[in-house]
């Protein structure tokens, strides 16, 4: 586990995770797909639409407004994705980061 953590973090414990691509809204799963980059490796990520709505205190955003909503919230979303990445909280196949409302509760 320590070797894996070492490969996922940079020198002095700094994460090497940087902004990746905005992939788009997946209606069937009700998630916005995006990626983060660790060196040369792209990390698949997703955030639930309910999490984005909760962040903005909205009842429900329309599907055609999801991309704009993600862009407004992108810094906060990516910060939480980086935290889950540092904690090695991967899900799915291929392993990636999935953000839900609970991930933003303090």
Please place each PLM-identified region on the residue numbering.
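A short, structured beta-strand/loop element
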Residues: 33-58
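Short, exposed beta-strand "edge-strand" segments with a Pro/Gly-rich flavor and a Y/T-containing core
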Residues: 21, 39-47, 90-99
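Acidic, low-complexity intrinsically disordered segments
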Residues: 2-13, 58-106
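Short, charged/polar N-terminal "headpieces" of proteins
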Residues: 1-36, 41
